A protein has these predicted regions:
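Short hydrophobic beta-strand elements that form part
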Residues: 5-6, 81
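CheY-like receiver
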Residues: 40-97
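Conserved sequence signature across two-component system core domains
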Residues: 7-8, 33, 51
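Extended hydrophobic secondary-structure segments
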Residues: 7, 13-14, 58
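Two-component/phosphorelay signaling modules centered on CheY-like receiver
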Residues: 2, 11-31
Length: 97
């Protein structure tokens, strides 16, 4: 079973993604957060296998959050960035998302 965390400030986006992911038998949503500070704590507490991360959060950009925790994440965590803004694509790719 893969542990999943969703970090997004839009509750509707979290619920849509949760609904889509819950039909996958090998994925378990372990937590959600609406900002980077709560998301960072969830990541460090839960050690997810898969992180869905919105690029635009109220307190920090998702790319910046990933950059800040990179040294602390010592497990294999896959990151899926998503956003409505294509201007962040290259920066996200540079962060290995």
């Amino acid at each position: 079973m893969y542990k999943v965390i969703i970090i997004d400030d839009e509750k509707a986006a979290i619920e849509t993604l949760r609904r889509d992911l819950e039909v996958q038998a090998d994925l378990e949503i372990k937590g959600t957060a609406g900002n980077g500070a709560k998301g960072k704590k969830l990541i460090m507490d839960i050690h997810p296998d898969l992180l869905f991360l919105d690029i635009e959060l109220p307190d920090i950009q998702g790319i910046r959050l990933l950059s800040e925790i990179r040294e602390q994440v010592l497990w294999d965590m896959k990151v899926v960035f998503y956003t409505a803004y294509d201007k962040y694509l290259l920066q996200a790719l540079r962060e290995s998302a």
